[in-house]
């Protein structure tokens, strides 16, 4: 969840906000 972060495979925020 955030920048350069894959949270739940892009379900919440994604690889980039």
From Swiss-Prot:
Protein's GO biological process = neuropeptide signaling pathway
- Kindly list the places in or outside the cell where this protein is found, as annotated in its UniProt entry: Secreted
Q: What is this protein called?
A: Pyrokinin-5b
- Disulfide pairs here are none
User: Could you say which protein family the record assigns here?
Assistant: Belongs to the pyrokinin family.
What biological function has been recorded for the protein in this entry? Myoactive.
- The primary site where this protein sits is secreted
The lineage is: Eukaryota, Metazoa, Ecdysozoa, Arthropoda, Hexapoda
């Amino acid at each position: 969840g955030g920048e350069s972060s894959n949270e739940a495979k892009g379900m919440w925020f994604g690889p980039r906000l």
